[in-house]
């Protein structure tokens, strides 16, 4: 079966969207089913509104439900992305029921490979448990 150019191009796209449930996300449903997008990126704050908790993230259970449903409507496995760097750049905040995530700068100052690995593993576990498989966290961040 041949895949149309439109659907091939769709695989190159990762789209943000508004809504915490699929019922609120008609645009992204169309992007996934009609255009075969490669993934989505999740945010907690809608910058136009400027208030935390107004975009895609409300709680760990809500987030897992959303990511499961997004995967279930897609023909292919979606990249489900987030910016969960820790410190100032964190989407999974304590106010939503997640643990505080220290910044990588703080972890670097500790200069302890065991703590660094534990921190990495902790972030990976939280993301995995929420159905998130792509973290746009910095590999190298110079301040």
Question: Residue ranges of each PLM-predicted region?
Answer:
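Boundary/entry segment of secreted carbohydrate-active catalytic domains
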Residues: 1-22
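Alpha-helical scaffolding within the catalytic cores
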Residues: 23-29
């Amino acid at each position: 079966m041949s895949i149309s150019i439109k659907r091939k191009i769709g695989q190159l796209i990762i789209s943000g969207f508004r809504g915490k449930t699929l019922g609120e996300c008609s645009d992204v449903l169309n992007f996934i089913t009609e255009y075969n997008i490669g993934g989505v990126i999740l945010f907690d704050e809608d910058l136009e509104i400027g208030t935390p908790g107004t975009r895609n993230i409300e709680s760990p259970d809500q987030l897992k439900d959303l990511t499961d449903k997004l995967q279930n409507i897609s023909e292919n496995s979606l990249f489900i992305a987030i910016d969960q760097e820790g410190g100032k750049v964190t989407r999974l905040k304590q106010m939503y029921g997640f643990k505080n995530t220290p910044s990588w700068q703080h972890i670097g100052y500790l200069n302890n490979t065991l703590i660094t690995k534990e921190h990495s593993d902790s972030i990976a576990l939280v993301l995995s448990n929420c159905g998130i498989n792509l973290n746009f966290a910095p590999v190298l961040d110079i301040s």
